[in-house]
Amino acid sequence: MYDLPDKRGHFGPYGGTFVAETLISALDELCKQYEYYRDDAEFQAEFFHELKHYVGRPSPIYHAKRWSEHLGGAQILLKREDLNHTGAHKVNNTVGQALLARRMGKGRIIAETGAGQHGVASATVAARYGMECVVYMGSEDVKRQATNVYRMKLLGATVIPVDSGSCTLKDALNEAMRDWVTNVSNTYYIIGTVAGPHPYPMMVRDFQAIIGNEARQQMREEYGRQPDALIACVGGGSNAIGLFYPYIDEENVRMIGVEAAGKGIDTHEHAATLVTGRPGVLHGNRTYLIQDENGQIIETHSISAGLDYPGVGPEHAWLKDCGRAEYVAVTDDEALAAFHALCRFEGIIPALESSHALAYAAKLAPTLNKDQLLLVNLSGRGDKDMATVAQQSGISL
């Protein structure tokens, strides 16, 4: 039986707690509180009640029949996380962490965001539970995701653009950490992915595991068996781990994480951390990183803001090393082609992040038999990406 992380938050040599001394007691307290509430029937009941009545779960599994026929080969099934309230998987985690923050007596939540989806999901739960919310966002992403910035402000959050470094997700994370160190007594930091110091990778995974737990039951009821492969995009990797985790002990189900190859992994313009990186320490944990020979973080690139991150969750690093999961990379152009295909064949506009998983499914399906099943995590909808996609087609909105 798979039972990681260990007590100190390690997945093999990855994970752990590499943070300033000032945060150790806050993380210890968070660990203690989370371990208590994880087994608390009342907390769990409230969490599942909110997922059902506020988020709109369970999200269905949809057979992309026309697209599957067009591609030939395996059947492509979509786990429709795009249908959640706020339009992506992120809200599964923010609901859980906000309920925890409330029980810990914290009235202020902070968050970092790349594509803006986690920022929106954090602002949403802050409004839902009457909390103050501050969101840190790289100034580059603020430009790319103007609609989501406005959504956060509508929901009552303060959005702080970050102008340091590459002005993207990693820099927003740095600023959020600084804020937390300064205001730890009244502030809860909602990390949006399975990265950061322990207990975050475990906690975010547990809240996102609703995806895979639902999928297992739905596959059993609707198809009488489990899929041959799971496919999900990986930036930090929370939507992927949410789908993968409940399947880890099922060795006959392949797990495939799809990273952003950007303009190609042979260029410096990509974010394929597991495919090209090597281990190091960033944002409080040891994991694979995109770094130069001196250990300096290299700036990443992806057409999708949510995959534009030089690290990855430590559990993914471990799943790669032990061979349980496979990791591949898909270029901007391949993701765009899959984005357009899903629009045309199925009437579903996917997020650019999710389009990376779709693109790999489109490559894999024709190599398999018609009776094989590929379950793709459609982690979010594409409304936020309209301007980016239009720009690629030479259209200004």
Swiss-Prot record:
Positions carrying N6-(pyridoxal phosphate)lysine: K90
Single GO MF annotation: tryptophan synthase activity
Pathways per UniProt: Amino-acid biosynthesis; L-tryptophan biosynthesis; L-tryptophan from chorismate: step 5/5
Keyword Nucleotide-binding on entry: no
Cofactor(s) annotated in UniProt: pyridoxal 5'-phosphate
Enzymatic reactions: (1S,2R)-1-C-(indol-3-yl)glycerol 3-phosphate + L-serine = D-glyceraldehyde 3-phosphate + L-tryptophan + H2O
Pfam families attached to this UniProt entry: PALP
GO cellular component: cytoplasm
Keywords carried by this UniProt record: Amino-acid biosynthesis, Aromatic amino acid biosynthesis, Lyase, Pyridoxal phosphate, Tryptophan biosynthesis
InterPro entries xref list: Trp_synth_b_CS, Trp_synth_beta, Trp_synth_beta/beta-like, TrpB-like_PALP, TrpB-like_PALP_sf
Source superkingdom: Bacteria
This enzyme's EC code(s): 4.2.1.20
Purpose: The beta subunit is responsible for the synthesis of L-tryptophan from indole and L-serine.
Assembly and interaction partners: Tetramer of two alpha and two beta chains.
The family this protein is said to belong to: Belongs to the TrpB family.
Protein known as: Tryptophan synthase beta chain
The organism of origin for this protein: Nitrosomonas europaea (strain ATCC 19718 / CIP 103999 / KCTC 2705 / NBRC 14298)
